[in-house]
């Protein structure tokens, strides 16, 4: 829910995907990423809103493996992907094709220990 003084997110352009938080912790992590890496995070926003499954740069953007590769969001099992914002900073997200929404499930300023 938007609050006075809160950040305003642009609506998606025609053909683009909408980005939403799938977890409260992701919203907190997103704000930290905004402070630490605003330029690379804006690039991530642009890429994810255009094509969340873009495979142009697989070292930066790829589907997570094994148990991390799917996640339940709103009662649906969705693919879970990772976008490398910087060397250590990551975003995990789940695209929902039926509503063209990318759910941000993790936004981390450090390398997620789950992938070690």
Spell out what each predicted region is.
Residues 1-89, 95-116:
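Basic, Lys/Arg-enriched alpha-helical interface segments
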């Amino acid at each position: 829910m938007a609050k006075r003084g809160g950040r305003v997110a642009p609506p998606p352009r025609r053909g683009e995907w909408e980005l939403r938080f799938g977890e409260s912790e992701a919203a907190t992590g997103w704000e930290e990423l905004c402070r630490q890496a605003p330029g690379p995070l804006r690039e991530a926003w642009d890429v994810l809103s255009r094509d969340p499954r873009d495979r142009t740069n697989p070292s930066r953007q790829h589907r997570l493996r094994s148990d991390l590769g799917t996640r339940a969001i709103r009662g649906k099992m969705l693919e879970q992907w990772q976008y490398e914002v910087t060397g250590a900073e990551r975003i995990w997200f789940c695209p929902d094709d039926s509503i063209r929404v990318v759910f941000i499930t993790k936004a981390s300023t450090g390398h997620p220990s789950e992938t070690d």
